[in-house]
Regions:
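Intrinsically disordered, low-complexity regulatory segments enriched in Ser/Thr/Pro
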Residues: 37-65, 72-75
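Negatively charged, low-complexity tracts enriched in Asp/Glu with abundant Ser/Thr
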Residues: 1-33, 54-68
Length: 75
């Protein structure tokens, strides 16, 4: 189970700022807007990253691994 959701949300928001992307953060959910798609992130027991068009999320326990995946999707 992930801990310190506020820290995780802050780190993901910082990543969006670094890439100059628009995002929306509400509760334990973050949506990052790319040019032609969106990335939807949900914080529950895991950090779940949903790509547009995929039903099953990428799930991570570690923030570093989730950030790596987000960077891969963004760039």
């Amino acid at each position: 189970m992930i801990k310190n959701k506020h820290h995780i949300i802050s780190e993901i928001e910082n990543l969006a700022h670094i890439y100059d992307l628009e995002y929306q953060s509400v509760g334990n959910e973050i949506k990052i807007y790319l040019d032609d798609t969106e990335i939807f992130i949900v914080l529950n027991k895991f950090i779940e990253i949903y790509e547009n068009g995929l039903d099953k999320p990428h799930s991570f326990l570690e923030l570093d691994k989730a950030i790596e995946k987000l960077q891969e999707l963004i760039s």
